[in-house]
From Swiss-Prot:
Name of protein: tRNA(Ile)-lysidine synthase
Protein family according to the UniProt entry: Belongs to the tRNA(Ile)-lysidine synthase family.
Entries under SMART domains matching the protein: TilS_C (SM00977)
Role summary: Ligates lysine onto the cytidine present at position 34 of the AUA codon-specific tRNA(Ile) that contains the anticodon CAU, in an ATP-dependent manner. Cytidine is converted to lysidine, thus changing the amino acid specificity of the tRNA from methionine to isoleucine.
Organism lineage string: Bacteria, Pseudomonadati, Pseudomonadota, Gammaproteobacteria, Pasteurellales
Annotated positions binding ATP: 21-26
Species whose genome carries this gene: Actinobacillus succinogenes (strain ATCC 55618 / DSM 22257 / CCUG 43843 / 130Z)
Amino acid sequence: MSLLSEFQAQLQHSRYLIAFSGGADSTALLALFAKSRQNRPHLQLRAIHIHHGLNVAANDWAAHCRRICEKLEVPLIIERVEINKKSGIEQGAREARYAAIRCHRHADEIVATAHHLQDQTETFLLALKRGSGIKGLGAMQRESRLYGMPIFRPLLPFGKTELENYLRAQSLDWIEDDSNADNRYDRNFLRNRILPVLRRRWTDFDLAVSRSAQHCYEQERLIRELLTPAFEKNYRKTDRTFALSDFAGYSPNKQNALLRMWLTACRVPMPEKMQLAQLIRDVVFAKPDAVPQFVLGEQVIRRYQNRLYLTPHYADVTDFRARLTVNKTVELPDNLGRLHLIKNTKNLTALWQYEDWQYSADFPLGEQQISVGFGYAGKVKLHARDMSRDIKKVWQKYAVPPWRRTRIPLIFVDGKLKSAVGFFDVF
C-alpha cells in the first residue's frame, strides 16, 4: 500500500484543522491532506501556523507557510502568541500553541498534528527517562484528546525519511529550524546524539519501540477497564469526591491505581510514587477523628466522613466582618461571592450568590444592626424547644466538612448569630 493510500485509509472525518509549522513533517501532513481531496471531495481543510516569535526567521517562516498553503489551496490562519516562560520555553511554547489552536478550532474540526514514527520513539524514551509507568510509556496514540480537543496523528506509522521522499516527489520544500540542533534540549539530545547510535545497531529500533508503546497503551486500557467498576462505585462526580469505605480491603496496587484514576478524573498533576504512599498513610489511613490534609501543588487533598475531597488552598477569612444595609451589595472575601440585603413587606432577606448557586436567610423587620462574618465557636439553638449545643455538632449534622464551615456566611443581628446562610437559622 502506498503512503498516500495508507494515509487516506485512516481518514474517518471530514473537517480537519492542520497544525502547520512549515517543517518537513507538517508539510507532508498538509500535502497528504490536500492530495486526499481528489478522491474525497467532502474533506474541508484549514491550516494554522503559530508564530512564536522565538526565532529571528519567524516572519520568514510565516511567509513560507502562506506560500505553501496558497499552492495547495488550503486556507491558513497565522496566529502570533506570547510565551509564558515560567515553566520553561518548551512547555510555555507548547501551552501557547495549543491555546491558540483551541481558540480557532471549530467545534466539528479534528486537530491534525504531524507526529511520526521517530517522534514516537523520542516520546517513549523521554517518558522512560522520567520513570513513567505504562500510561506514560504508551506515548502517543493515533487519536486522543489534549487540552480539551480531539487530536489526530495519522503520520505515526511513517518514518521521517519516507515523508521527506514524498515531499521531494511532490516538489515541495520545507523549513529547517536551526534550534533542532541545540542539544541542550532533551528531545534534540536524543534525536541527534543517542538515537543514531541505536539505529545503526538495530535498524528496526523505531518499529520495536512503537510496538512496546502500543503494548503499554493496551495494558493501561485493560487496567482501567478492570478498575472501572470499583472506581465508579466510589467516585461521586457531583463534588469529585472519592469514598473510602472499601479502600482498606483492596490490595496496595489497586489502592494506588484507584487513587491515580481519581486524580486523573480531577485533572490534577500526578504525584510521585513516594507522595502517593504518603497520601495513603497520612490521609487515607489517618485516625477516624482526624481532619488530615495533603498538599499537592495548587490543590489540597482532605478527608471527611470517610471520603476524599480535593480543594484549592483557602485563605483565612475569619477576620472579615461587614455591616449589611438594605439594597447594598457586599463583596465577600476570597471569591466567596456576594451578599445582598433585600427588604420585603414582612421581613428582610439576606441573599448569598456564590458561583452558580443562590442561598437566602430571612429576618423580621426592625431597627436591628445586621452584619456578615465567617467562623463561629460556641453553642446554638435551632428551635425554641431545643437544647443549646455546640455549633460543631450542627455542622456535623449537615455533613459540612470543617474547611467549609469557615467559608459559609454567618448573619449576625445585633451581634448575635442568627443564620448560617443556606444551612440553618439560629433561634
